[in-house]
Amino acid sequence: MTLAEEHETFQRTFQPQKLTLGLIVPFDNATHDAYAFATQARLASLADDVGFSSLFVRDNPLYSPHLGDVTTKYDPFVFLTYLSTHTTNIALGTSSIVATLRHPIHLAKATTSLDLISNERLLLGMATGDRKFEFPAFDIDSDQLSTTFQQTIESLQSMWQSHSPHIDNDLFSLYEESGLQVLPKHRHIPMFATGYAQQTMTWIKKHMDGWMFYPQAFQQQKALLAEWHDSTHFKPFMHPLAIDLDSNPNALLKPIKGGYHLGRNTLLQMLKQYEKIGTNHIMLHFVNYNRTYEDMILEIGEHVIPYFLPHSIQEEHKHGIIR
């Protein structure tokens, strides 16, 4: 068993040839303004109760009006810590931390603290970043993103493993046997590359615990998954998916940006196909602002989630639903 597989939430969220479902947060309105924190907490708790496996947030340090209307972005670690106090089992994920803009020491301490506070529920998506205006603001050489990403990942793994790791790279060095005072429970937190992160698939397979990709044409995703899952050791694959959930459960599929407009029965059949080709987790992003989040969470919870339960719950109900 790998260090990642010892992590309780990793096991609860990911298993070979099985799919689970999560949600993208924060929850927002039609103008992409996030709801009040009390509402975020209530909806997160509801998602936890009905069997969603994860809540994922993005990390964008800066905003520019040139981006247009985008969802409100809070500091991911602070926001997830808040949600952790209002939920019990659901995974708390990042999609994704811009690893190149954060010092590894700060990352190591923040992630360790959140994983311990939440009872080992953190799933750490990591990215190189794609907003070009952020790199000069942080004095980051955009030509060195690949190397910076690699060294950040390696530094985190070392700092989680030992109170006095030996680290001496282009980013920083440690002296006088220094390190974190408190380590993660399993001396590791599951990490997932987002996209290629300017790496090769071979590097990602070797150094990361899984892969977070993007929605793309089904046959393209199928081919990518065949290549990803070709090794003997399981590492999960996941991606977000925008869903404009029609109130008609039988509404047929219509493409939208990053996903589909469809009814719940069509969604269920589509998700079964994603599971069949090897997708292990999908984070749904609800974009229908004519319906309440409560309504959509409850509908998916009643009619779709039972086919894609978190794995601890699947064991308890293994004689129930026939998949």
For each feature predicted by the language model, list its residue ranges.
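Hydrophobic faces of well-ordered beta-strands that scaffold small-molecule active sites
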Residues: 21-25, 55-57, 92-94, 122-126, ...
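An alpha-helical appendage that flanks or caps ligand/catalytic pockets
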Residues: 1-17, 143-187, 214-323
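Flexible, glycine-rich active-site loops centered on histidine and acidic residues
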Residues: 16-35, 99-168, 290
